[in-house]
Amino acid sequence: MTHPLDRPIWSALTTRQADIAERVGSAVRLKPDYGVFAAAADASERSRIALNYLDHGPEGLWLVEIDEVEPPPGLLVVHHTAPCVQMVADHVEAPKSAFTIERLGEADAADMFELARLTKPGPFFEHTNRMGNFIGIREKGRLVAMAGERLRPEGFTEVSGVCTHPDFRGYGCASDLMRITAARILARGETPFLHSYADNTGAIALYEKLGFRLRSQMTLTVLVREGAEGAPVIGHG
């Protein structure tokens, strides 16, 4: 039986997060205002062809699997691939943070979107903040750091959207927010996990220090319509 984290997008969007997904036959994707992630039911040509009929948007479809996804016959071609790592944590202690940590909600959505666009922590769209719980740090009313939850397969929750304004890096904001987020996931009886680009060695070292360990090598495949102009924005892992 396939482990849920071997196919995190399919596992999440066909179970706990099916309400924010769009499905066409054997293919599924996040609704475009939530994100760009998509998956086919399996690696068969029949399942992959269904990817052609999803809404591709200007950013294309982002698939995260153990192996690179072969483009289906038809409209889609590979625009970009990147090796990634998937990490999980079995124990994380929430820090006694020197910062005032706030829970972020709909009233903070515009500030969250602005910070994500500035820092590029990965794909972040109008309603990405609704995918799970987010927390943040404000300085004189300005949101300067945040972290939250994204994909939620059964028994697991992804830590994502971690970013800090350039003027406030080096103070430990991101590590505190990540530890708090991961500890709260564990307290719910779930396992926190995350993804990073494999060449982002600095980030991976930080994640290991926080209590995460390597679970699997993964591959990001970005599929776009043949002949599409421009490139999707690839954020930091």
Model-derived features: where do they sit?
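Conserved catalytic-core motifs of GNAT/GCN5-like acyltransferases
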Residues: V77-A89, R213-G230
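A conserved beta-strand-loop-helix scaffold within acyl/acetyltransferase catalytic domains
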Residues: P123-H165
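Conserved acetyl-CoA-binding loop-helix of GNAT-fold acetyltransferases
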Residues: R46-N52, T164, G170-A187, I204-K209
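Conserved active-site alpha-helix within GNAT-family acetyltransferase domains
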Residues: V69-L76, S175, A198-S216
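A short, internal acetyl-CoA/4′-phosphopantetheine-binding micro-motif in the GNAT/acyltransferase core
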Residues: F37-A41, V162-R169, Y197
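Short amphipathic alpha-helix that is part of the acyltransferase structural core
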Residues: T2-D6, D90-G122, V233-G237
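Conserved beta-strand-loop-alpha-helix junction that forms the acyl-donor binding cleft
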Residues: V64-V69, F193-I204, L220-A231
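Acyl-donor-binding surface of acyltransferase catalytic domains
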Residues: T2-K96
